[in-house]
UniProtKB/Swiss-Prot annotation:
It holds the Pfam family MMR_HSR1. It comes from the Bacteria. InterPro entries: G_TrmE (IPR031168), GTP-bd (IPR006073), GTP-bd_TrmE_N (IPR018948), GTPase_MnmE (IPR004520), MnmE_dom2 (IPR027368), MnmE_helical (IPR025867), P-loop_NTPase (IPR027417), Small_GTP-bd (IPR005225). It is found in: Cytoplasm. Mg(2+) binds at S241, T262. Belongs to the TRAFAC class TrmE-Era-EngA-EngB-Septin-like GTPase superfamily. TrmE GTPase family. (6S)-5-formyl-5,6,7,8-tetrahydrofolate binds at R29, E91, K132, K460. Its cofactor is K(+). The gene is mnmE. This is tRNA modification GTPase MnmE.
Length: 460
């Protein structure tokens, strides 16, 4: 977008984090055509740099015309188009107490009827509409703000730098090249030799492989950003609560020798190897006539469905028996699962059936023997062993549009296979390109844009 989009109103909001109510500095951001004039009305300054673009100067916030000052501030002016939003932007750097920053904001809003509180994400939305950033960069800004670990923050910054757009544009350019040739053949059929379907299918296969790789990595991206939810499942008294306490490094669940001690779900959020994990301790599964315990067991099966990963724990003392097999059969086949044999300190591992050892981690939770192997197994099965090779974060919206594009390309294969009219290839390729354009924000409705930016914080 070359032109700068402006609106009649000017927006303002607290742009810094002040959730605890205290801080050294708080920033009020103002954007719009009245940003500078509105701030001039409430700021007294003698600085020779006052109101110059990209200059910081000192001033005082004036509450009324009687020169009553309420705060000493630093003011940063960024004039259109050289600002984040593309509009005139002023930042007021106040002292960080919640009382004073709210007071300054209130004075600012009362200075001009065309200044209002910004909607969530409205600064970023204006930056997008003015062509300062694409939609993936805007979403990456929000991801960076909400990052829960360093790797998630790194992926978010990669998106801010435009890495997502680069990958999408690369795929889109491949499809545009194919589309240009096909449309030229449709319009000037007599000027071309026969169409090389084999070459076309080969080129499209390469494009599909790029898309499939992005979609495949998207789940791993989600684990890095949102975390892995891990349900501890098994019969009573096999060590589920002990494992929760071991991973949490503190006692979160009551541990006794009495079967059925855990009757409700206990959840603990941890960060292990810089990956957020939610460990869910569930009630032991067994036949029972006790009503409260039965409710807990029902919740256990509910958590199996909700979780990304299942650790099924059984006692090596008792062995892996028919009851264990029956419970595992209830776990959906698509679920990632690791079987953990606990209490290895109480038995001679040489006497364990070799079939039982297959795909099983042997552990002594009591003696903390096997924790590293368990963590490594979780990370490997979730595809995070080579986490450094994942350099972008694709959210659910991106994945949906990539899948739609992949569906379009699969349809072109069917068109060729069934010898359907040649111009249908053009239609599917155009739809595929359009689905890719939606990712970067070139093909979106105003309603959908509003929905995306509404999930941002107000000051961004």
């Amino acid at each position: 977008m070359d032109s700068i989009v402006t609106t009649e109103d000017t927006i303002a909001a607290i742009a810094s984090a002040i959730s605890i109510g205290k801080g050294g500095v708080a920033i009020i951001r103002v954007s719009g055509k009245d940003a500078i004039n509105s701030c001039k009305k409430i700021v007294q300054t003698k600085s020779k740099y006052a109101w110059e673009s990209h200059r910081v100067f000192r001033g005082f916030i004036q509450e009324n015309k009687q020169n009553k000052f309420i705060d000493e501030v630093l003011i940063l002016v960024m004039k259109s188009p050289n600002s984040f939003t593309g509009e005139d932007v002023v930042e007021l750097h106040c002292h960080g107490g919640i009382i004073i920053v709210n007071k300054v904001l209130k004075i600012l809003l009362s200075s001009n009827s065309r200044v209002r509180i910004a909607n969530p994400g409205e600064f970023s939305q204006r930056a997008f509409l003015n062509g300062k950033i694409d939609l993936t960069q805007a979403e990456s800004i929000n991801q960076l703000i909400n990052a829960s670990n360093t790797r998630s923050a790194e992926l978010a910054f990669s998106g801010i730098q435009g890495e997502i757009k680069k990958k999408i544009d690369d795929i889109k350019n491949d499809l545009i090249n194919q589309l240009c040739e096909i449309e030229a053949r449709v319009d000037f059929e007599e000027d071309f030799t026969d169409f090389d379907y084999t070459k076309y299918l080969k080129n499209i296969k390469k494009v599909k492989e790029k898309i499939e790789l992005l979609i495949e990595n998207a789940k791993r991206n989600s684990y890095i950003h949102n975390g892995i939810s891990i349900a501890l499942i098994g019969k009573t008294n096999v060590g589920k609560s002990s494992l929760l306490n071991l991973l949490a490094k503190k006692e979160k669940a009551i541990v006794t020798n009495i079967p059925g001690t855990t009757r409700d779900v206990i959840e603990v959020n941890l960060t292990i190897n810089d990956i957020p994990m939610k460990i869910i301790d569930t009630a032991g599964i067994r036949e029972t006539y006790e009503q409260i315990e039965s409710i807990g067991i029902k919740k256990s099966f509910g958590k199996i469905k909700e979780s990304d990963f299942i650790i099924y724990i059984y006692s090596l003392e008792e062995g892996f028996n028919e009851e264990d097999k029956k419970i595992i059969q209830e776990i959906p086949k698509e679920k990632l699962i690791t079987i953990l044999g606990n209490k290895k300190d109480l038995i001679d591992c040489k006497n364990i059936n070799s079939n039982e050892l297959k795909n099983t981690i042997l552990m002594s939770i009591k003696n903390n023997d096997g924790e590293k192997l368990l963590i490594d197994t979780i990370i490997k099965k979730c595809g995070l062993k080579q986490v450094e090779n994942i350099n972008i974060f694709l959210n659910e919206r991106h994945q949906t549009n990539l899948s739609a594009c992949l569906s379009n390309l699969n349809d072109t294969d069917e068109i060729i296979e069934n010898k359907l009219p040649f111009d249908l290839l053009s239609i599917e390729l155009r739809d595929g390109i359009q689905n890719l354009s939606k990712i970067t924000g070139q093909e979106l409705t105003e309603e959908l844009l509003d929905n995306i930016f509404s999930k941002f914080c107000i000051g961004k």
